């Protein structure tokens, strides 16, 4: 296996939504009113030759419209790893919001 076959994978939390357990599950559960926030992540997958971003997240304005707290912009989360978001050519989108 060469070094180009080995990737590092980073989960980068950028925001959250305060909510209760019942909001996170479809079926009734114990303690439905207990706090259970939902965290929001983007992913960076990289090796010496390539960087792939999984999902792109949202900014402060979109977070506010959706009632979410954005702790840092996704581009800033990537920058914490030395990744310039504007130079990434490969992006995987796992789902859409509408």
How would you describe each model-predicted region?
Residues 88-98:
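Metallo-beta-lactamase
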Residues 1-6:
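Basic/polar N-terminal segments that are highly enriched at the extreme N-terminus
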Residues 82-87:
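Beta-rich strand-turn-strand
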Residues 10-12, 92:
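Hydrophobic/aromatic beta-strand patches that form the interior of the parallel beta-sheet core
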Residues 7, 14-81:
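Conserved beta-strand hairpin/beta-sheet module of binuclear metal-dependent hydrolase folds
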């Amino acid at each position: 296996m060469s070094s180009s076959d080995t990737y590092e994978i980073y989960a980068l939390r950028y925001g959250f939504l305060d909510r209760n357990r019942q909001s996170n599950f479809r079926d009734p559960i114990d303690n439905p009113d207990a706090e259970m926030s939902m965290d929001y992540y983007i992913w960076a997958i990289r090796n010496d030759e390539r960087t792939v971003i999984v999902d792109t997240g949202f900014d402060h304005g979109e977070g506010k419209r959706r009632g979410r707290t954005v702790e840092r912009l996704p581009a800033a989360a990537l920058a914490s790893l030395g990744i310039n978001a504007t130079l990434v050519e490969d992006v995987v989108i796992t789902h859409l919001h509408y």
